[in-house]
């Protein structure tokens, strides 16, 4: 015996457009979907500040970070927590044009090291960045986030249009942890880090 429900179904309520949940037009992707979440580690930039050092030391920190990046890419894996510390010390090439000048005698070794580790495209991009690369100091990031907090921002979309290695994004306060953060970076080495 089959019994039919002849009751009419309640119509769905009409919801104004501004109250409707919108589906994002931007699709997220996972660069390494095969790596389990348990093997992923978020690096805490706020508690791992990078101190100022001279040009040669900045070069060697950058070089070490590129080496870690290349290892991770070649092995199709994320950086370990120890490797993340090395990556966090990458500051780009702004202010170190000597490393790209084959005539700078004191920088001959570093010049050769860069030519050896970077692809021609990466090298050209890094060389171009010597005049334009700038990494936002933590104090500036913190001040901007404080203003956003005072304005009541807790969740929504945040765009970092020139994110470098993610220093600004890495300073995101707990109060905004539900925000969707989008980062764009032209330099492939910085973006990879």
Annotated model-derived regions:
Residues 2-16:
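Acidic, proline-/serine-/threonine-rich low-complexity intrinsically disordered repeat tracts
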Residues 9, 18-193:
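Class I S-adenosyl-L-methionine-dependent methyltransferase catalytic core
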